[in-house]
Amino acid sequence: GKERMHRTSGIIPGVMAQTGMETSEIIQGIVAETKPDVVIAIDALAARSTRRLNRTIQITDTGINPGSGVGNHRVGLTEENLQVKVIGIGVPTVVDAATIVHDSMAHLLDTLEETEQKEFLEEMIAPHLHTMFVTPKDVDETVKYLSFTISEGLNMAFEEISE
């Protein structure tokens, strides 16, 4: 048999602070011009558990909303916005200070009611830390391995073996 790859293309649209353009605007223009069957959007995510940080790869058929995990809501890369199917792939690479405190004190917090937990966490975390997001010091190496894993998965998904 003979192997053949589907025709694919890729772009790294950057972030609005770098480009001055919404990622969705860039992708909408490309979609309008190239008319793909599907868009695969890959993004970093904010973890809601320190256990998931750099350890999971999330896949969805509902797209991605860039910046939403860190409170920087942008226009989503969704089928509704792009008029084409969108597969979202995300890896939690950052975590906020509240999640770190919550996970570190989980056993104590389990003894409290939900409203008490929230009050406790609000008192424990200084106001300027509410917008602090951190990433592990080995994030560059980890992203290299995770991106290889994702790229190999995509390569296998796009392979077409004909006999």
Regions found by a protein language model. Give the residues of each.
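Glycine-rich phosphate-binding loop
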Residues: 24-75
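Short, flexible loop segments at boundaries between secondary-structure elements
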Residues: 69-92
